[in-house]
Amino acid sequence: MVRSNDVKFQVYDAELTHFDLESNNNLQYSLSLNLSIRNSKSSIGIHYDRFEATVYYMNQRLGAVPMPLFYLGSKNTMLLRALFEGQTLVLLKGNERKKFEDDQKTGVYRIDVKLSINFRVMVLHLVTWPMKPVVRCHLKIPLALGSSNSTGGHKKMLLIGQLVKDTSANLREASETDHRRDVAQSKKIADAKLAKDFEAALKEFQKAQHITVERETSYIPFDPKGSFSSSEVDIGYDRSQEQRVLMESRRQEIVLLDNEISLNEARIEAREQGIQEVKHQISEVMEMFKDLAVMVDHQGTIDDIDEKIDNLRSAAAQGKSHLVKASNTQGSNSSLLFSCSLLLFFFLSGDLCRCVCVGSENPRLNPTRRKAWCEEEDEEQRKKQQKKKTMSEKRRREEKKVNKPNGFVFCVLGHK
């Protein structure tokens, strides 16, 4: 009528928050189980008159919890929660002690759950006689993150995560301080080395976390087989164990993500610091190029001014020499003109005296002689005029030679 696969018992969630064996062999524990009972039949209902859950470790009883009575209808599911906590005396032998130490190292404990049940099956309006099956679940429960005796528990992960955040904040403050110009270069180098060392340590920690997750997920839950009609029915805990391991893995992945976020923030801060330094250096180089361009432009103007000053200086020196030469030439021309005028005056005075003397001579003088004398005088006067004309032309040529350099100098000075 009722087969073992018609009613399914499943531990879909388990949380072991405390599991510590003291030196006096007292085992302190705290375990919570979430159970689901599924009636897959559409024609029967089940009355549960007794339901008790008992936990065992190394075949030694830890504690038992009675569950409330209930009726499970057709194609229906009942969810139950059982809490086991307290302490009990546990005597472990040599091999069992070694297994406990192995469980303590890995953080995963092999715990058995026994369900003692009395139920009656109702078909239509008929109720059968009581049945007393026993259901056993073989569990491998990892010690919950955050437990007091967990070697790789959540408290340590949270502490490490907080240390990562604090270190990232300190590195961020150090990077902001390094932006100042008054900070020594040695301090900047030390802060950069510290950031690299922190990044390497964080990568090692993340690698260790991944290894821990792989070890925890490597445990394969026990898949029990049995008959519901026999005295003991072992129901596997494959799905619940997978869900539990997945939950623990997700929690650890969240911590890993937090650490990666902190690491990425530190990387971003370091990159921003490097970008700001590069921007500052680029701006300084641009300012240097601007100053250099202005200097080059001004240098061309200065060279033009120097060249013009040199040309003006040479032109002024040349003009000065021409002026001195013209002054000397003008002085000599004036003295020459004065001398010529004086000689002309003397000649004219001599001719006048001679004419007076000739006019006053004796009229009985020989006419032939007087004619010859007059001819001589005319010839002499003609020579004098020719000489005067030659001297006048020579003086004009010299004046032209003197006036040409003076005009060039004046034009150059006027242009400048």
Swiss-Prot record:
Report the PROSITE patterns cross-referenced here.
T_SNARE
Q: Which InterPro entries match?
A: LEA_2, SNARE, Syntaxin, Syntaxin_N, T_SNARE_dom
Q: What is this protein called?
A: Putative syntaxin-24
- Report keywords, A-Z: Coiled coil, Protein transport, Transport
**Signal peptide interval:** none
Q: What does this protein do?
A: Vesicle trafficking protein that functions in the secretory pathway.
**What residues does the t-SNARE coiled-coil homology domain cover?**
265-326
Q: Where is the sequence biased in composition, kind Basic and acidic residues?
A: 390-401
User: Its family?
Assistant: Belongs to the syntaxin family.
Q: Name one GO biological process term.
A: protein transport
Q: Where is this region: Disordered?
A: 375-401
Q: One GO CC annotation, please?
A: membrane
Q: What gene is this protein a product of? A: SYP24
Which CDD domains does the protein's record reference? SNARE_Qa
**Subunit structure, interactors included:** Part of the t-SNARE complex.
Do the record's keywords include Protein transport?
A: yes
The residues forming a coiled coil are: 374-404
Which Gene3D superfamilies does the record associate with it?
1.20.5.110, 1.20.58.70
Q: Which SUPFAM superfamilies match?
A: t-snare proteins (SSF47661)
Q: Which domain of life is it from?
A: Eukaryota
